[in-house]
From Swiss-Prot:
Family label: Belongs to the UPF0750 family.
InterPro entries: UPF0750_membrane, YitT
Source organism of this protein record: Bacillus subtilis (strain 168)
Cited PANTHER family: UPF0750 MEMBRANE PROTEIN YITE, UPF0750 MEMBRANE PROTEIN YITT-RELATED
Location in the cell: Cell membrane
Name of the protein in question: UPF0750 membrane protein YitE
Positions of transmembrane segments: 10-30, 41-61, 82-102, 105-125, 154-174
UniProt keywords, alphabetically: Cell membrane, Membrane, Transmembrane, Transmembrane helix
Membrane protein topology class: Multi-pass membrane protein
Amino acid sequence: MAELLMKAKLTFMIVVGGVLQGLGMSLFLFPHDIPTGGAAGIAVLLHYLFQIPHGFSVWAVNVSMLFTALKWLEMRTFTGTLASITVTSVSVLIFDAVFPDITSNLWLDLASGAVLLGLGIGLLYKYKISNGGFGALALMISIYRGGNPGTILLIMNCIIFMVTASIIDWGIVIQALICQVISTRVIDFIYNIRLTSLPYLTPMYRHKK
């Protein structure tokens, strides 16, 4: 019974974290082509160039990276991350369809989107679930090398949104930087809050042979 309750709690956290990310990206950041780094940054670029829906791109890029890292991940970690990716991507697709182009204030949207993004990712990290391919890498580096995962994610994301901005518009670089700084602070804040732990959710990674 106790294990069932813990699994239910984990599922709830994955859904909440994924929906928060999808809400922040779809309603506040993607309408302004603000790259959030990682798969979402690539999704912005693909939508700009080929009009591919953000949700599909976010899912495809993240899952591709996740399968690439499969040999380092235990199946439990892999399935949890896959679930969070799917919830986020579906949320983006739903919010894009239900609330198309409802935003107008760039800086208010930027702040709102960054906070929601940070809350979603931070909540997933807190329960040892990655938010995607880049998130899995940041979490692994944090575990094995030390440091806050949000800061590590910031460094990797900077590379992605610099490439994206060079193609779309260099003006979004400042917006992306501000988004990353805000969301990183929120991620680290949530990650370091003492919450009820789930004992069986210790991150599982395979040792190199």
